[in-house]
Amino acid sequence: EALGTTSGSDDALPALAVIAALVLLLAAPAALRSVRARRLLLAARRGDAAAAWLVVQDTAIDLGIPVPASDTPRTLAARLAQSHGAPEAAMATLADALERASYAPSGTIAAGDHDALADAAAASSAALLRNAPVARRILAVIAPRSLVMRPGSAFAGAGTHARA
């Protein structure tokens, strides 16, 4: 090989580095959302009803389902069950637990209910994803809106679509 020439593999390294950086950049939102969901489900397993409810709200926001501040947990739970395929029993479990956590004396959620809380949140979130159109599901995974939009905000309340 003559002096001053480079092999083809040396020329490909910068391009591969750019491609690898782009892949990591594109995967970051999905990874952050996954970590957040796992952390919330872990908190739900410790009895945090608000964390369990937030798992479902985040999934709804990611799918473009409106989560307005004016909806009570029971109203949103009913709408997600009736219009978006969330399991009614799981949504009732979450709404009841959130109401108990908000209005009942502390310590009224039995330890055995903690797993049920996390299971209800996971089942509801999975059902919302499963019942959403494929394009909306893909967008929810690769560009989760819940990372920048909180439940009850003006943007979360508007959603991106309404399903009847």
For each predicted feature, which ranges?
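Alpha-helical transmembrane segments
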Residues: 19-37
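Flexible, solvent-exposed extracytoplasmic
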Residues: 1-4, 159
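Juxtamembrane/start-of-transmembrane alpha-helix segments at the extracytoplasmic/lumenal side
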Residues: 3-21
